[in-house]
Amino acid sequence: MENFQLVLLLIGVIAIIGVLVHGFWSIRKQQPKEYKQSPMADISRERRDAQGFDNDGIGAVRVVKNTQQDDEPETIDDEQRDPLATETVTDAFELSGTPATKVNKTRVEPSLIPQESVFATDMPVQESLFGADEISVAAPVITEQAVRTEPEPRLQPVFKPEPQLEPVELKPDPIVEPAPKQEQTEELGEPRDVLVLHVVAKEGEELSGAELLPCLLTLNFKFGEMNIFHRHEDNAGTGKVLFSMANMVKPGVFDPDNMEQFSTQGVVLFMTLPCYGEALMNFSIMLNSAHQIADDLGGVVLDGGRDEWLESTKQNYIQRIRAQA
């Protein structure tokens, strides 16, 4: 792209130079010969009339020599010497090789004639610098007819009557209401296995209901059927139930309105197999919830047999899940 711009720039410069050269050549060709010659050539020439005066009205200096002093010219004071006359005398001595002729002893002063009479009578009229070929440019004459511009005729718009279209009654399309999505009810059948986790208080302590309720709400548990808490597919508490949490003490229910006065030895989290969704993902959520409750309330996580939760126990639960897949 840069090379293309450079080529265009060079072409433009060459075109401009060509136009300028052609213009100067055309102007030079149309000029008369008098324009081509220097107009100062004739002025620089020394012209003298019949009485010996040049264009400035200055005559040639006449040198008067004494008969007794032939070899010594008469000196003239610097104040009386005319600079133009001095230059003329100097040029005359340099160009002329012959000695000046002797004249009478008396000094003859040049008679000064008014310049107006000289120029009026004897001085030839100086020709025009441009000669007869002087170019006269005629100014354009503006006539009244040219000034008076005829008003343009106004064109009247021609409106063609459009054919009137008969109104067509547009019937609105019937609004098709989307059919309500029918929840896919999967028949899980009878549960074949149950995964159980216990969160119990330490020896001599109890789990406080005032601390348990905020923890359950943070973990997206929702109080529901059978008066226990459930964990649903959606965090807002909608969808299928993934797993549930009950009170470890009989009858195993909760009273949300009296949770501040509630206390228990522990809670139990359980998940049936098969279940809705991915069983491994559901078990991972249940295990993390159990650990979070134990950390917030100061409890301990145990397995279904109320034994200490170990990594081997976790692997055993995973194998049970895969067996039911």
From Swiss-Prot:
<dbReference type="GO" id="GO:0043093">
    <property type="term" value="P:FtsZ-dependent cytokinesis"/>
</dbReference>
<keyword id="KW-0472">Membrane</keyword>
<feature type="transmembrane region" description="Helical">
    <location>
        <begin position="7"/>
        <end position="27"/>
    </location>
</feature>
<dbReference type="GO" id="GO:0005886">
    <property type="term" value="C:plasma membrane"/>
</dbReference>
<comment type="subunit">
    <text>Interacts with FtsZ via their C-terminal domains.</text>
</comment>
<keyword id="KW-0132">Cell division</keyword>
<feature type="topological domain" description="Periplasmic">
    <location>
        <begin position="1"/>
        <end position="6"/>
    </location>
</feature>
<keyword id="KW-0997">Cell inner membrane</keyword>
<dbReference type="GO" id="GO:0032153">
    <property type="term" value="C:cell division site"/>
</dbReference>
<dbReference type="GO" id="GO:0000917">
    <property type="term" value="P:division septum assembly"/>
</dbReference>
<dbReference type="InterPro" id="IPR007449">
    <property type="entry name" value="ZipA_FtsZ-bd_C"/>
</dbReference>
<keyword id="KW-0812">Transmembrane</keyword>
<feature type="topological domain" description="Cytoplasmic">
    <location>
        <begin position="28"/>
        <end position="325"/>
    </location>
</feature>
<dbReference type="InterPro" id="IPR036765">
    <property type="entry name" value="ZipA_FtsZ-bd_C_sf"/>
</dbReference>
<dbReference type="Pfam" id="PF04354">
    <property type="entry name" value="ZipA_C"/>
</dbReference>
<comment type="function">
    <text>Essential cell division protein that stabilizes the FtsZ protofilaments by cross-linking them and that serves as a cytoplasmic membrane anchor for the Z ring. Also required for the recruitment to the septal ring of downstream cell division proteins.</text>
</comment>
<keyword id="KW-1133">Transmembrane helix</keyword>
<feature type="region of interest" description="Disordered">
    <location>
        <begin position="165"/>
        <end position="188"/>
    </location>
</feature>
<protein>
    <recommendedName>
        <fullName>Cell division protein ZipA</fullName>
    </recommendedName>
</protein>
<comment type="similarity">
    <text>Belongs to the ZipA family.</text>
</comment>
<keyword id="KW-0131">Cell cycle</keyword>
<keyword id="KW-1003">Cell membrane</keyword>
<dbReference type="InterPro" id="IPR011919">
    <property type="entry name" value="Cell_div_ZipA"/>
</dbReference>
